[in-house]
Amino acid sequence: MDNPHYYSPPITRNVIGKRVPRTEDARLLTGRGKYLNDINVDGQLHACFVRSPAAHAQITGIDTSAASEMPGVHLVWTSADIEQYCAGIEAQYTAEGCEAMTMPLLAKDVVRYVGEPVVLVVAESRAAAEDACDLVGLELEHLEVVLDPRKSIQGGPVANGERPDNVGIRGRASFGDVDEAFSNAEHVVSALYHPGRVAAAPMETRGCLADYEWTEDRLKLWVSTQMPHYVKMCLSLFLGFDESRSEVISPDTGGGFGQKAHVFPEEMLMPLASKHLKTPVKWVEDRRENLLAGSHAHEQFVTIQYAANAEGRITGVRTHALVDGGAYHMPPQTMAVECWATAAVTPTGVYDIPAAEYVYEGAVTNKCPMGAFRGVGYTAGTLARESLMDDLARKMKVSPFEIRRRNVVREFPWTNPQGVVYEEGSFLEVIDALEEMVDYPAFLRRQDEARKAGKYLGLGISVFVESSGESTGMMQAHGATDVFHDTATVKMDSTGSVTITSGLNSQGQGHQTTLAQVAADVLGIPFESISVDAGTSTKGAYGSGTIGSRAAVIAGGCVNRAAYAIRQKLVAVAANMLESSEEDIVLEDGFASVIGAAESRVSIADVAMAVYWDSSKWPAGFEPGLEFTKAWDTSRPMFSNGGHALIVELDPVTGFVKVEKVYSVEDCGVIINPTIVEGQIRGGVVQGIGMGLFEQLAYDNAGNLSTTSFLDYQTPTMDVSPPFEIRHIETPSVMTASGVKGMGESGLISAPAAVLNAVNDALSPFGSVLYELPATPEKVVRATKGIIDLQGPQDWSELWERAGVPALDRGPMDRE
């Protein structure tokens, strides 16, 4: 379904590329937005959950009598009450070696992580439901807990009886002659990296409101989600609701970042409760619940090894990615969403490495399940690749820019060892731009002067490539069979105004603005005459979800195709009205005009009026109507690229690290709206700073989460947001009509690696290197004293033999 990317005549970029103010902002910033918790319906009841206080325990008894008898309580359910409706939910995405697991809606017999839903209570108010939850008696017999994925995967205590070996996923692959690369290597560098466990922590937590109308057998579900059509499918797949009689509505959503790209047990229970009670039921989680049970992200143990020649040219890479997957697979992605992407997609990155071998494993543990979060899989993989590249630079005694230049891909199209084609890119240009922006020689002088004064500055860089526009073609290129496609409807009325209905909903990305910009240029009409419904209801256009940096590419592609179909009809009628050939008609600035005869023109509004009301203006064989629904699904993956450089100042006494400035270079093809793109860069990088320096979901030895509020879980605030300098490079994609690529995840993909590299650069006078995030003050102070908590494996063979990979020919560490 790829669209032709050349138009005849060419479409003028009048609105695309402009800093058009976001049309949705006035409504949202003045408090006129309508989020999930703003929506109420007559007669609604409120739901709360009794959640497991234990990480792993046998349920020996549940006493709900007192809660059931409490005034105002309408329903108290345990797993026994819902078995007749649903056996549980399962993930659908495919990945080699992924083992099926069922997540119960309410824990049955065994609880497997702190925060797992055990009992549902529905009452006339939230307060009453919470009070009733306190009256539920829960008797547990504690079982052995496994929290470390390294112990779990090696036969530790069984975390989930469905997977007695604790393996949620395991796979391997090899491309090129990896053994030869390592046998002939002049240098081998290796390291183990551990990005910590983090939360997406959207400003708006999860929630839903189910309204089942029993007289018509119809369900309406409002839900804070990134994937409303997937939620609708799950209502049918797991609960038996008729899709044709179900509507899922996604209202204004206060952030998602991947966490809301799942279906959760709570979201399936509300429709069941509403159907049972014949009244609406609402559930909105509090922050503690969100941090306990809203899916976790990014924690992996990534072991990576480079083989390099005498000049530092990398000839082979081996990667082992072990994810702490938690107690279950999260639908739809499974725990493969982290380890598979880290191992299979990221090890070569922007570098021309001819041979690659990888193993990915997902360990089942007694923690909240692992889910998607901005940069999923890419963040950990980029951290390992880019940090080890700095290790190689130190070994070769060259700058971090130079070592990357020696290895970067320079000619396109380029095919990586896995067979994935990169049609275009600006990999070298990004490295050069970053070095120029930071003025590297000047920084080195300033760093030296600061050290003499007892201050420690560090520079960290990270360059990346990001697959964007998640599509069926992209999944097929990586060996998966999952289907992604979307549709959009574009309708022009008789006055020339346009309404767009997109299948992709927004969580603050600015879809209403960017999609209108795309249509404005295709149709040649003012931006202000276009309104956009961005996926608010499944009654409209279809969407596979606002995930994977796909909105501008996929939703934009759908709008582009539908608008272009309208454009062709406008051109046909305008040519007839102006007595010209269609090839000579240009649509621009609200007018249809003849090339070379500016005075010969007619307003597009008049052309639209003729289409609707005056058949005398039609050419022969013309069919009425100015409304089209078009689908879009790119046949091959496309990639944006870029890089970030951070300068930090490190205090060796307190261990505090301050980010002084961020330099960002982004190539996402043709930029629709620079202001929106830069907002995405800033937001993603600041999230990366949080992950790099202080965000961490911490468990104690019993499996209790210690960070259950924003007092403990430290998200970045404006006081840690540094100044930015941003530069754009435009390498248009040959896969899209407008040349656009996706970029929403790039900041969090790359920034944590830049943070770690900057901290390690600042630590270099102390002879220490950190391999673990976050780089907390405690870890930094210990590093200044030569104490490093995380050490790489001394025997690599066990990592590979576990998955059937031969032991390495070279030693694990070759660092000077």
Curated annotation (Swiss-Prot):
Keywords: Alkaloid metabolism, Cytoplasm, Metal-binding, Molybdenum, Oxidoreductase, Plasmid. It catalyses: (R)-nicotine + A + H2O = (R)-6-hydroxynicotine + AH2; (S)-nicotine + A + H2O = (S)-6-hydroxynicotine + AH2. SUPFAM superfamilies: CO dehydrogenase molybdoprotein N-domain-like, Molybdenum cofactor-binding domain. Due to the increased usage of tobacco products, the industry generates solid and liquid tobacco wastes containing high concentrations of nicotine, which dissolves easily in water leading to the contamination of the ground water. Nicotine-degrading microbes can be used for bioremediation of these nicotine-polluted environments. Binds 1 Mo-molybdopterin cytosine dinucleotide (Mo-MCD) cofactor per subunit. This is Nicotine 6-hydroxylase large subunit. One of its GO terms (cellular component) is cytoplasm. GO terms for molecular function: iron ion binding; nicotine dehydrogenase activity. It comes from the Bacteria. Its EC number is 1.5.99.4. Pfam families: Ald_Xan_dh_C (PF01315), MoCoBD_1 (PF02738), MoCoBD_2 (PF20256). It is found in: Cytoplasm. It comes from Paenarthrobacter nicotinovorans. Heterotrimer composed of a large subunit (NdhL), a medium subunit (NdhM) and a small subunit (NdhS). Pathway: Alkaloid degradation; nicotine degradation; 6-hydroxypseudooxynicotine from nicotine (R-isomer route): step 1/2; Alkaloid degradation; nicotine degradation; 6-hydroxypseudooxynicotine from nicotine (S-isomer route): step 1/2.
